[in-house]
Curated annotation (Swiss-Prot):
InterPro entries: ATPase_NBD (IPR043129), Gcp-like_dom (IPR000905), KAE1/TsaD (IPR017861), TsaD (IPR022450). It comes from Brucella abortus (strain 2308). Fe cation binds at residues 115, 119, 311. Substrate binds at residues 137-141, 170, 183, 283. One of its GO terms (cellular component) is cytoplasm. Gene3D superfamilies: 3.30.420.40. This is tRNA N6-adenosine threonylcarbamoyltransferase.
Amino acid sequence: MRVLGIETSCDETAAAIVERDDMGEGRILSNVVLSQIAEHEPYGGVVPEIAARAHVEALDRLVDRALNDAGLKLYEVDAVAATAGPGLIGGLIVGLMTAKALAMAAQKPFYAVNHLEGHALTARLTDGLPFPYLLLLVSGGHTQMVLVRGIGDYERLGTTIDDALGEAFDKTAKLLGLPYPGGPTVERMALQGDQKRFALPRPLKGEARLDFSFSGLKTAVRQTATELVPLTDQDVTDICASFQAAVADTLSDRVGRSLERFKTEFPDCATPSLVVAGGVAANKTLRAALENLCTRHGFAFIAPPLNLCTDNAAMIAWAGAERAATQAPDSLDIAPRSRWPLDEKSAPVFGTGRRGAKA
């Protein structure tokens, strides 16, 4: 089965075609991503209206390029999939409406994909990973520990009770006057700094629950920087290094407890695995810390290639292909959802508003 996937949930416009065979093995035929960093850089963050307009301008040509790169015509794909949430509602509408129109024009089945499910299933595309496994999803909008039992069968073990980790990286960069996007910049500066100079907190470290918290760490960074004004270049690199070390320690503690829980629930699992996905998973220091943690606990550490950690359409096409193997297509009247928890059975951490559960 060949599936055309479309991703427009935030500030990347993407289209891809993925093939899934009868044995469940996947192959990426094309994967095109257009970043909007240049459009949002002057504002220090993503502006939803600008993002939606950029998706409108770029998506048609990206779909054409994805088809051309795969050597296919639209009628030769077997299904169309698009991100329906969670994300910025304007961007979701652009991608969802485009995908519906293509599916209707080509008379192909349509699948509305949860963006988080795309991340959750990427390791099955790249590594053929069997169920069950643990997923650490770390991005600008989400920080979650998820038990993946099967397609559509997810249990949220822990989530952030305040800021997502990617947001904490971006806010730290902004506090220090570093350019957007903040995550890669903080990582690069940290390589030159002294991680022991500042004793920053490790939020929730040692607690039995599996949730995350990063707002206190972000506040500590702001207080440290304020006390040092005017900041020298060495101050900035040392703060970045101390911040990143605190994050690595916090993740190792939180994830380590999740690994122990997994072993208790699945004592007979032959190859227990931790999958790390999301944009923050591209951070090499954090990946190394988590890989060492997995080695100590007897887990396989699986991180998709860096270009599949950040937002892309290959993961959306693959999630659509996985669902198509066992589930009926979605109706074309399905609506986008700015909030769409991966595990809708769990109680929302932040409560429920008019638009649904927040996390």
